Amino acid sequence: MFIDCSKYAGKCACGREHTMETRAAVIEPGCLFEFEKYMAQFGVTGKRCALYGENSYAATADRHPRAEQKIVLDPTGLHANEISTAEVLAKLEGDVEVIVAVGSGTIHDIARFCAHERGIRFVSCPTGASVDGFCSTVAAMTWYGFKKTLPAVAPEIVLADTEIIKNAPMELVLSGVGDIMAKYTALADWKMAHVLTNELLCEKIYSIMQDAADTVMQSVPGIARGEESAYADVTYALIMSGIAMQMMGNSRPASGAEHHISHMIEMEPEAFPVKFPAMHGEKTGVGSLIAVREYKRLAKIEDITPYITDYAPIPEEHFRKFFGERLADSLIKENENDCLAKVSREKLSASWGELRHIIDDLPTEEYLYRLLEMLDAKRDLASIGVEESELSVLLKNSPLVRNRLTLMRTRRMMKIYEIE
């Protein structure tokens, strides 16, 4: 499968001109053996450094891309953060002109960030269908404990070898399925924000993301049977998600309330115990179930007007008490110009019928749960290290990790505990 990314660039009916940094993506068995052909075809020249984790280095042993320098990172406790990026930047030879990421999500975020810091080119070789960030223009980092996106470089070319991807640990593709499942609530949140505040909504990008999500959900039985074509479908959807984000210029089409749930768990607030880590996509998959359940509950209300309250900012004291001093200052700054302040009582009341229709179009929690169950994937809070008793705390505080309008954030303007 060859994706010509240039066709997604240019003027659009939404009024914007979309730009694309990624030129092409190849999703084929054995395509890493043809690495040199694609580098020549797209004119990617200069000294290379290939960045691996120990696991991806072993998995691709018979097809390592040619590179003058190789950096292999210890996967123990490896995260895309200030520590790993400092290590790579210190090791990266000064005359390297191209970074080649050979690995899954963490390796890619480290590589794309370092490419941006050095002002050099970036090529992506995913070894697991685990996250939708392969084509991203930003790096998803945990920076001094705070989950944030930092400027980075999108890959010029993506070479996804499905022979490698299919033989990767099952938890990687389960994470990828969870990350794509998350697009349903992310898209609903985007559309609801458009209704409430006239936030820009591009129908072309929306359609790309919707199709990607539907493709993966239909491929779940094939994944369960170990079919390589199903793994290719997941990889395709993850890459298209990244292309959609490039077109938009941010992660809005791919990230909503379910991602904020995942991010809050990853940040480990002081007053929120997390027993053990889980992969990003595993958390967004569970986050999707939680968000769909809550949104469907709210949609049962025919008239929200009696439950609407005035907007009120979150007191600084709450950030310090719940998130702790390690995270408080960053989150206070993140929420300074609260997007929820743009939503009036009148607009929320008048738009409620339209919001209910958007929620009605979401897949049911039962349908999404059955798909995760078919793969024996994680599908409740306990499986991702969080007590079920913490659910209400999670729903209340997770929107605060990102200043982005979602229905979950809008709950602050509802007398939520009076709604049965």
Where are these regions (language model features)?
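Solvent-exposed alpha-helices and their adjacent loops that cap or buttress functional pockets
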Residues: 17-19, 42-43, 91-94, 115, ...
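A short, small-residue-rich loop immediately preceding and capping a beta-strand
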Residues: 94-114, 118-128
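ATP/NTP phosphate-donor binding region
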Residues: 1-98
